[in-house]
Amino acid sequence: MARVTVEDCIDKVDNRFDLVLLAAHRARMISSGSQLTVDRDNDKNPVVSLREIADTTISPEDLREELVHSLQKFVEVDEPEPDTVPLIGSAGASVDADDTEVAVERMTEEELLKGLEGLAPPEEQPEEDE
């Protein structure tokens, strides 16, 4: 009975692995007391869940949403975004009066080279041969 049911379900759910996940989730829902949408006919919960999917008495998309929701550890809450802040240097950006200019010391190329000469080179470590 289950083999025929699986072949019927492949038309509704393209991927066999997705079908297994959805049917298992629905079987767990039935075990926890969810209402059946087809007659049990002395079948076990996995077979009943496959029959429900094959008969389209339950939507695979709804099952997928319920499965994802059951696996989520944290519920995402959409919070309002803070007011947008204009980008620095964007065209048309207004300059506030309380902005202070930061003094940046400029360095010539010669001063940079003199500073680099004063730095000690890194010590070379001898390579070990294996």
From Swiss-Prot:
Domain of life: Bacteria
Class in the EC hierarchy, top level: transferase
Keyword entries, A-Z: DNA-directed RNA polymerase, Nucleotidyltransferase, Transcription, Transferase
Keyword Lyase: no
Chain positions covered by the region annotation Disordered: 79-98, 109-130
GO biological process: DNA-templated transcription initiation
Pfam families assigned: RNA_pol_Rpb6
Catalytic reactions on record: RNA(n) + a ribonucleoside 5'-triphosphate = RNA(n+1) + diphosphate
InterPro entries given in the database record: DNA-dir_RNA_pol_omega, Pol_omega/Rpo6/RPB6, RPB6/omega-like_sf
Transmembrane segments: none
EC number: 2.7.7.6
Gene Ontology MF, one: bacterial-type RNA polymerase core enzyme binding
Keyword match Transcription: yes
Coiled coil: none
GO cellular component term, pick one: cytosolic DNA-directed RNA polymerase complex
Record note on quaternary structure: The RNAP catalytic core consists of 2 alpha, 1 beta, 1 beta' and 1 omega subunit. When a sigma factor is associated with the core the holoenzyme is formed, which can initiate transcription.
Protein family (similarity comment): Belongs to the RNA polymerase subunit omega family.
Cited function: Promotes RNA polymerase assembly. Latches the N- and C-terminal regions of the beta' subunit thereby facilitating its interaction with the beta and alpha subunits.
Protein name as it appears in the record: DNA-directed RNA polymerase subunit omega
Gene it is expressed from: rpoZ
